[in-house]
């Protein structure tokens, strides 16, 4: 299953708590709060820790069902989008995991689902194992705003990851409106990087400033010549007018300097784009960076016209919390 997961895990986790994902309703979360499903960190085991309802578990856990039926949770995604794949993670749930689970979805421009909502099955019931990741591709290209996560008949799940492409009505953006074209909420996604040993590349595009050093992109210490880099696909083609490189929380491990290249890419696979990025034009010439600071660049930006992709180069290595690419949409 992991071979299928590699491709879609590069997409944005639409169910990330940092994007605003939350439980709207749940049939039962007696043992463990269902909102834990969306935490960005891996599930943990706390030996010997109990609360008033029993063993503390890092995930959603319902009571043992003593009547007909099954448990479900209605979820509002932090950002609506088309789903590419899901990971149902039962880490540390061994004698208390559900034997199976399914997913339904709907799209609402406003409000929450009710008894009249029409749900679409996006993942038929699949078997689950204890203490395991379950990766499944989704073959429905509609945008969805809400999910109904069903577990049969009861039990616990540690995490639910929902990878996809955020939906944004770009026609509603004004011609003179400046937006962050790289933001995860606007469909930006990190495609590839040289290294992400200490922090995932996708963190660069999360909303808000970083929570801590782990909530950014950080590479291992480079012991060979060269520099580290990350390639980002913008949510929409546009002209960049302002760049923000934020090294918040990175003090003894921030890059000495950075530069950015850009291009209007018309096609090709992610791996082909990685190779082509070596020859992209310079959008932002090399700039010195400081620790634990937000760096804004406007006058230093070179006019490349509309672009779809950028390559952030850091010299020689280190950590960056956030990257913002503000500009106007090319319609």
From Swiss-Prot:
Query: Any keyword Secreted?
Result: no
Top EC group: hydrolase
Enzyme Commission numbers on file: 3.5.3.4
Q: Which GO terms describe its molecular function?
A: allantoicase activity
Concerning Pfam families, the annotation shows: Allantoicase (PF03561)
> Quick one: signal sequence residues?
none
What pathway or pathways are given for this protein in its record? Answer: Nitrogen metabolism; (S)-allantoin degradation; (S)-ureidoglycolate from allantoate (aminidohydrolase route): step 1/1
GO terms in the biological process aspect are: allantoin catabolic process; purine nucleobase metabolic process
InterPro entries in the cross-refs: Allantoicase (IPR005164), Allantoicase_dom (IPR015908), Galactose-bd-like_sf (IPR008979)
* Keyword line: Hydrolase, Purine metabolism
The catalytic activity, as recorded, is: allantoate + H2O = (S)-ureidoglycolate + urea
Report the family membership: Belongs to the allantoicase family.
Q: What is this protein called?
A: Probable allantoicase
What is the scientific name of the source organism? Pseudomonas fluorescens (strain ATCC BAA-477 / NRRL B-23932 / Pf-5)
Gene behind this chain? alc
